[in-house]
């Protein structure tokens, strides 16, 4: 596989392979000396056209722990702010000898364009494109679930996952639905009708507008809360929900809803969180919460992705 652009690029064996390699990478990070020589002499460029804390620093840490040289590119402090196109930026990076380009862009499909337009010969990793996809987030979420819900090996066959919130604007939700289904999990999306995308009925998952019923009757193994992405909501199209208070009442995870969950259920969030809106402080900081763990797991998963793209072999996927 030359690129990782979508969770759909991975079949079951390829996805499990990434998770297995991530487990091996995580083991190396428990040692006193964490750095590996695997990608010495390779150059990884973090090309971020949107703000990011967790994803950008996670990819930077992953590449550096594999001994790659890292170039961090921010659109705000570059010629992009002067009108330079994605093509010209990519050609500049190609001239610098980039072996991999990790790209986050506000336009859906930008990483695919970068990978297939002939502007770069390096591997392209989608670190989030618009409201489309975020495959490495889905991989780290699946990795986190596997560590808690299985023996830490194999797939997620039979696991029940409820994803709650702003699905309409969430690239995380899309990638998770695709990957979790590939790994054998059953996924239910819960959101108000205004925050579900057109065509969601064709996604490989169930949908519901009733969070209490989904938690009480679905007996989920994992509940993933999604951030309400107010910055992507066009006010000219009207309100997506009556008020923040009403949204929290209907779709927020707090003390009462935590009590509906089976004892083993984990609580997840891809971050950043709106505490007090989609998730209460009590839920976010509870013993069930894996939110901080997810951030740490992201480094191991992204180490695995970079290793398999640049030094290993990942079967299937985008050629």
Curated annotation (Swiss-Prot):
Record's catalysed reaction(s): carbamoyl phosphate + L-aspartate = N-carbamoyl-L-aspartate + phosphate + H(+)
Cellular component, GO, one term: cytosol
An annotated Gene Ontology molecular function: amino acid binding
Enzyme Commission number(s) of this protein: 2.1.3.2
Matches recorded under InterPro entries: Asp/Orn_carbamoyltranf_P-bd, Asp/Orn_carbamoylTrfase, Asp/Orn_carbamoylTrfase_sf, Asp_carbamoyltransf, Asp_carbamoyltransf_Asp/Orn-bd
Biochemical pathway: Pyrimidine metabolism; UMP biosynthesis via de novo pathway; (S)-dihydroorotate from bicarbonate: step 2/3
Keywords annotated in UniProt: Pyrimidine biosynthesis, Transferase
Binding site for L-aspartate: 82, 171, 227
Gene3D superfamilies the UniProt entry points to: Aspartate/ornithine carbamoyltransferase
Positions contributing to carbamoyl phosphate binding: 54-55, 104, 134, 137, 271-272
Domain of life: Bacteria
PROSITE patterns recorded: CARBAMOYLTRANSFERASE
Similarity comment: Belongs to the aspartate/ornithine carbamoyltransferase superfamily. ATCase family.
Task of the protein: Catalyzes the condensation of carbamoyl phosphate and aspartate to form carbamoyl aspartate and inorganic phosphate, the committed step in the de novo pyrimidine nucleotide biosynthesis pathway.
HAMAP family attached to this UniProt entry: Asp_carb_tr
Matching NCBIfam families: asp_carb_tr (TIGR00670), PRK00856.1 (NF002032)
Description of how the protein assembles with itself and partners: Heterododecamer (2C3:3R2) of six catalytic PyrB chains organized as two trimers (C3), and six regulatory PyrI chains organized as three dimers (R2).
Name of this chain's protein: Aspartate carbamoyltransferase catalytic subunit
């Amino acid at each position: 596989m030359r690129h990782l652009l979508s969770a759909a690029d991975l079949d079951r064996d390829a996805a499990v392979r990434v998770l297995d390699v991530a487990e091996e990478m995580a083991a190396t990070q428990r040692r006193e000396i964490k750095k590996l020589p695997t990608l010495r002499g390779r150059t990884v460029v973090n090309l971020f056209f949107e703000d990011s804390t967790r994803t950008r620093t996670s990819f930077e840490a992953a590449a550096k722990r594999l001994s790659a040289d890292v170039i961090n590119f921010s659109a705000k402090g570059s010629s992009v702010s002067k009108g330079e196109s994605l093509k010209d930026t990519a050609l500049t990076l190609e001239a610098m000898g980039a072996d991999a380009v990790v790209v986050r862009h506000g336009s859906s499909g930008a990483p695919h364009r970068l990978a297939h337009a002939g502007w770069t010969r390096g591997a392209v990793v989608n670190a989030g494109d618009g409201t489309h996809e975020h495959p490495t987030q889905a991989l780290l979420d699946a990795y986190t679930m596997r560590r808690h819900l299985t023996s830490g090996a194999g797939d997620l066959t039979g696991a029940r996952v409820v994803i709650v919130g702003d699905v309409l604007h969430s690239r995380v939700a899309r990638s998770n639905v695709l990957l979790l289904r590939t790994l054998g999990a059953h996924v239910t999306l819960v959101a108000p009708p205004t925050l579900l995308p057109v065509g969601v009925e064709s996604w490989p998952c169930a949908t519901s507008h009733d969070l209490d019923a989904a938690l009480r009757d679905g007996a989920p193994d994992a509940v993933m809360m999604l951030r309400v992405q107010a910055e992507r909501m066009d006010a000219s199209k009207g309100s997506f929900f009556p008020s923040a208070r009403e949204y929290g009442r209907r779709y927020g995870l707090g003390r009462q809803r935590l009590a509906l969950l089976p004892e083993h259920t984990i609580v997840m969030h891809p971050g950043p969180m709106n505490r007090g809106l989609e998730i209460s402080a009590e839920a976010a900081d509870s013993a069930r919460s894996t939110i901080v763990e997810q951030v740490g797991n992201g480094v191991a998963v992204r180490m695995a992705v970079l290793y398999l793209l640049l030094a290993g072999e990942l079967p299937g996927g985008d050629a």
